[in-house]
Swiss-Prot record:
Positions with a binding annotation for substrate: 264, 321-323
Enzyme class: ligase
Binding site for Mg(2+): 199, 213
Positions bound to ATP: 46, 53-55, 99, 102, 107
Quaternary structure and partners: Heterotetramer of two alpha and two beta subunits.
Annotated protein name in UniProt: Succinate--CoA ligase [ADP-forming] subunit beta
EC number: 6.2.1.5
Protein's organism: Pseudomonas putida (strain ATCC 47054 / DSM 6125 / CFBP 8728 / NCIMB 11950 / KT2440)
Pathway membership, UniProt: Carbohydrate metabolism; tricarboxylic acid cycle; succinate from succinyl-CoA (ligase route): step 1/1
């Protein structure tokens, strides 16, 4: 689950980290009031969406009057912001962050992720702040500094100081960086984060360090023990199909192809997508119906897949273990009838009662193509999607 910038900064402040004074508002009038509360004669207004690239898309602006802040809020609230990280429809803006202006002398980068290879939290720092860190890592990997956190003792101040020296910081900046480093590490662990970024972490004109941005992603599998963070969830930022799928415990991720995929098991689902791609097709989604491929779940899965207008054919790939394939076939037939599927459906059943399941499908009289193997299924669905 992603957090908005203002929510991330709220957590930063709770851990004593330096952030700008600001207010998240949802009306133009509140934007003007926020300027009064903050004081000064310059403010930064930022549209709040779960996507990067807001500045280039016009979603971040320096304003010098309350009227300009009010106008910016009126321009974006209720609208969609399109950036290079969103689709063509963009993300809806329901909050504007109004905060004090910061005089920037230099921009740095500081972030942390869970590194699966080392099974540790790894911090990354760079002098190349304010830009796409993936691009820096690809083009100039030597500019990415790393510090691995030992889970037994946690982040240590000396690790922060070492990074600070490598970044060229000096004097009080070293101590400030070490404090930010340790604070972020504690925040990461306490809240079960999967990713954390401060980009940029800036050196202000007076020499002090300041967290100018906040990007936080929480491990969805740990949300049950983060009740406070559940209240931070903004459903308007979710993909509508993915949100609907979650209600039925279906794991769905929208893609850009035209072949809908419905599979039981994440590994089999990924393998199915690979073999479809191998035979010249493009998957429209990842969808794992889980171990219990019941009629209700299959029906909802069909509804979700077919809500994508790009889908020209559907591949159902089910391995029957505890659940018998003939029962799964009955569920597929019932779902196809209920939903009124108009596109070709290719079904590959394997496992418990697979032959009986194929017979049930063949006798249904519906536009369902029974595949004899995974390769056959991929070839059949690619042909069907091409209208052959």
């Amino acid at each position: 689950m992603n957090l908005h910038e203002y929510q991330g900064k709220q957590l930063f402040a709770e851990y004593g980290l330096p952030v700008s004074k600001g207010f998240a508002v949802d009306t133009p009038e509140q934007a003007a009031e926020a300027c009064d509360k903050i004081g000064g004669n310059e403010w930064v207004v930022k549209a709040q969406v779960h996507a990067g690239g807001r500045g280039k898309a016009g979603g971040v602006k320096l304003v010098r009057s309350k009227e300009d802040a009010k106008a910016f809020a009126a321009q974006w609230l209720g609208k969609n912001l399109v950036t290079y990280q969103t689709d063509a429809n963009g993300q809806p803006v329901s909050k504007i962050l109004v905060e004090s202006c910061t005089d920037i002398a230099k921009e740095l980068y500081l972030g942390a992720v869970v590194d699966r290879s080392s099974r540790r939290i790894v911090f990354m720092a760079s002098t190349e702040g304010g830009v796409d860190i993936e691009k820096v890592a690809h083009e100039t990997p030597e500019k990415i500094l790393k510090a691995t956190i030992d889970p037994l003792v946690g982040a240590q101040p000396f690790q922060g100081r070492e990074l600070a020296f490598q970044l060229g910081l000096e004097g009080k900046q070293v101590q400030q960086f070490a404090k930010i480093f340790v604070g972020l590490a504690k925040l990461f662990k306490d809240h079960d984060l999967a990713l954390l970024e401060v980009n940029p972490l800036v050196i202000k004109a007076d020499g002090d360090l300041h967290c100018l941005d906040a990007k936080i992603n929480i491990d969805a599998n740990a949300m049950y023990r983060q009740p406070k963070l559940k209240t931070f969830h903004d459903p308007s930022q979710d993909d509508a199909r993915e949100a609907h799928a979650a209600k039925f415990e279906l794991n769905y991720v929208a893609l850009e192809g035209n072949i809908g995929c419905m599979v039981n098991g994440a590994g089999l689902a990924m393998g199915t997508m690979d073999i479809v791609n191998l035979h010249g097709g493009k998957p429209a989604n990842f969808l794992d119906v889980g171990g219990g491929a019941t009629k209700e779940r299959v029906t909802e899965a069909f509804k979700i897949i077919l809500s994508d207008s790009n889908v020209a054919a559907v591949l159902v790939n089910i391995f029957g273990g505890i659940v018998r394939c003939d029962m799964i076939a009955e569920g597929i037939i019932g779902a196809v009838k209920e939903v009124g599927v108009k596109v070709p459906v290719v079904v590959r059943l394997e496992g418990n009662n697979a032959e009986l399941g194929a017979k049930v499908l063949a006798e249904s009289g519906l536009n369902i193509i029974a595949a004899t193997s995974l390769t056959d299924a991929a070839q059949q669905v690619v042909k069907a999607a091409e209208g052959k």
